[in-house]
């Protein structure tokens, strides 16, 4: 599976994504997994031709007041996923699908910094049904509706739910959350938002 090796590094990277202020909220149940796909459906969709979509350039989450440009995130020389250099700018993992292409497009953002709240500070409060817009370089926009938020210990990161291929477009927003471990300067949990068109 193409995404599994890269996805496994998320556990190490999420410590870098987070900084100082803990934002806590009661845990919510994980969203339902995507529907199972029979091998005949997978065969049909795997040969289906999907139109190429332009690169994502901006993320808008009206329910949170987020309206920010997107940066590209790749794989660092040590094999981990890069993290956004700017705490106010989320990053799209450009080794995965573009938002609107089949599969899970993944966008990472910081929860906070030593200076205060960052772009995904209130991500854990994003309600089911909220709309997330991704603007693309060609002027088009793809919108996703939140279907669930998962709070999970970094040691139990759900790699398959976040990165496993899907037949339809989907979006994952990932940040840190939960208790802050001062000895490691890292949050202990991840907040993952699952959204579909």
Which residues does each PLM region occupy?
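N-terminal export and membrane-targeting signals
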Residues: 1-13
């Amino acid at each position: 599976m193409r995404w599994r090796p890269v996805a496994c590094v998320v556990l190490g990277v999420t410590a870098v994504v987070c900084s100082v202020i803990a934002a806590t909220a009661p845990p919510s149940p994980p969203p339902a997994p995507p529907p199972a796909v029979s091998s005949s459906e997978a065969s049909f969709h795997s040969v289906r031709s999907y139109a190429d979509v332009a690169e994502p350039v901006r993320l808008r989450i009206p329910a949170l007041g987020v309206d920010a440009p997107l940066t590209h995130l790749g794989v660092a020389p040590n094999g981990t996923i890069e993290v956004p250099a700017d705490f106010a700018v989320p990053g799209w993992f450009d080794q995965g699908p573009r938002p609107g292409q089949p599969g899970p497009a993944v966008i990472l953002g910081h929860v906070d910094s030593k200076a205060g709240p960052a772009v995904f500070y209130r991500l854990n409060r994003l309600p089911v049904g909220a709309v997330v817009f991704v603007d693309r370089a060609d002027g088009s926009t793809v919108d996703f509706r939140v279907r669930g938020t998962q709070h999970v210990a970094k040691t139990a990161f759900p790699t398959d739910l976040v990165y496993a291929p899907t037949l339809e477009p989907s979006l994952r927003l990932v940040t840190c959350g939960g208790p802050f471990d001062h000895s490691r300067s890292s949050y202990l949990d991840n907040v993952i938002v699952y959204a579909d068109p």
